[in-house]
Amino acid sequence: MAEESSCTRDCMSFSVLNWDQVSRLHEVLTEVVPIHGRGNFPTLEITLKDIVQTVRSRLEEAGIKVQDVRLNGSAAGHVLVKDNGLGCKDLDLIFHVALPTEAEFQLVRDVVLCSLLNFLPEGVNKLKISPVTLKEAYVQKLVKVCTDTDRWSLISLSNKNGKNVELKFVDSIRRQFEFSVDSFQIILDSLLFFYDCSNNPISEHFHPTVIGESMYGDFEEAFDHLQNRLIATKNPEEIRGGGLLKYSNLLVRDFRPTDQEEIETLERYMCSRFFIDFPDILEQQRKLETYLQNHFAEEERSKYDYLMILRRVVNESTVCLMGHERRQTLNLISLLALRVLAEQNIIPNATNVTCYYQPAPYVSDGNFSNYYVAHPPVTYSQPYPTWLPCN
């Protein structure tokens, strides 16, 4: 009975994609995505299909077996529900591989970098370009994680419009989602096999069976959340610090909690985790600026509303934090919001404006000069922690 129950739960997490979804998946995999080079390096014109096939082939030639390849994140959500409110930001690909030692991590990195040579324009002398040079030219982010529960690496290829191509090589990972709506993964192997073997174009009456999986556990429930813009999760204590930023992003896109009481607990968890993972103000500033750049690249007018929502959540749900440090973070968010308004040279909707300035009593003094002297931007340099343990 236990085995049957486990099988039922496993089956609930999978679903077969319909033709509309397969068609959108085909569009995502065959769309040309520019990878922008730094300096004088040329732009690479790639498709996800080509980069996956190239990297997979080279990995297996190097002795690293790829168990499967999956489309993850907002791109997978876009395939399942076209107008879901999340858009299609980074193009996340997951390669399931074994990474038992440092040698495999290094080999994976070298294979990906060398694969980029295939996409350089004709006429470029590839013999003089080393993997290190390619990394400096085209890699936005390079991450390696090795812990008791997580063994994975990430190579993010640069796109100036925020649509980075992210190649993630996973041996093990404890948690692969934050909310039900971002828990989807689409297994690409059957479609990749179709591209390799079929002489006929893909069509409604001639296409492979493609399987999607929800890491949330219940595919239909998560799919309903995505269709109806609902916020739900499981084991919120496992969500890392970036979950607070993702949660605020969902709110600004008109997603709403499935359970208001549970969400209040979730907000407290996420705020606490944010301050644990990003303990000083400089780290918080870098994280926020990077998040805005990556997730609002083509949505400048949403940045202010996003920061106001984030500020409200931090203000209302932060616990285990010294008052001064809490105010410091709130001031940081406020300054970023004001900078956004200055950059856009716009006046926000008055109903959404929050005033952070009240004239001091001495301003009414007749001898007070209101002449403003410009100073360099305020920077935060305190390296001390901004959180206290809960007792």
UniProtKB/Swiss-Prot annotation:
Gene Ontology molecular functions: poly(A) RNA polymerase activity; RNA binding
Protein name: Terminal nucleotidyltransferase 5C
Assembly: Interacts with BCCIP and PABPC1; the interaction has no effect on TENT5C poly(A) polymerase function. Interacts with PLK4; this interaction leads to the TENT5C recruitment into the centrosome.
PANTHER family: PRION-LIKE- Q/N-RICH -DOMAIN-BEARING PROTEIN PROTEIN 44 (PTHR12974), TERMINAL NUCLEOTIDYLTRANSFERASE 5C (PTHR12974:SF34)
GO BP terms in the entry: mRNA stabilization; negative regulation of cell differentiation
Taxonomic source organism: Macaca fascicularis (Crab-eating macaque)
Keyword annotations: Cytoplasm, Cytoskeleton, Nucleotidyltransferase, Nucleus, RNA-binding, Transferase
Protein family (similarity comment): Belongs to the TENT family.
Record field: catalytic activity: RNA(n) + ATP = RNA(n)-3'-adenine ribonucleotide + diphosphate
